[in-house]
């Protein structure tokens, strides 16, 4: 079955998307190579958002799920996100250093070559409902460490978490650096049609094809993580109430 390719000429662009993108693009062009100290401070702010709002984040995810094990949220999302931020901070200096590359001296005698890491600009992230904290903050750790700015669109099935993050994030990072969006439904095509410098998507293959087609209109590079189901097997002799709570 082929995925639908949206006609972007007829897509209504929410004003908040365009306004935020323009603000982040302007901020990036005015200050396109943040220092190690600035990037480190951004990562610390991201970690503080998680640490200072742990209970509220867990509660919001539980509301979106209807009922979700606190243990699962903490160990598959919360601690994983903190570890990603910590790892980025620990490796940041090394990641920012220029890297030497070999040059064929027969072809280019006396030449030297090196790769200088540079920020891309404004990065978009489309987050699914199943692991909404992990799949927003883990990429954000890399995005901010690389000196970029980010717009994050949450799933329409993560309304409570999206609203919470949208209200919390400006207290830790300015909106021209990071902004979360709630998806009231049907806004994905508009988001993926923005001229990002890179776009990350996690979800189904069918939706991934549509996202890639939209991004192609702007020659936006994309990273697609395309998945399926996460089955759980409950043995006949295991207590059903305990299984339901943990799953």
Model feature map: region roles:
Residues 162-165, 191, 211:
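Hydrophobic packing residues within well-ordered alpha-helices of enzyme cores
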Residues 148, 153-155, 182, 202-203, ...:
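Short beta->alpha connector loops at strand-helix junctions that form conserved
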Residues 39, 85, 147, 178, ...:
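Residue-level signal for inorganic ion chemistry
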Residues 104-172, 219, 241:
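Conserved small-residue-rich beta-alpha loop and adjacent elements
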Residues 11-13, 206-247:
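ALDH superfamily catalytic-core signature
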Residues 112-113, 179-197:
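A structured beta-alpha segment of the ubiquitous adenosine-cofactor-binding alpha/beta core
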Residues 1-113:
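N-terminal Rossmann-like NAD(P)+-binding subdomain of aldehyde/semialdehyde dehydrogenases
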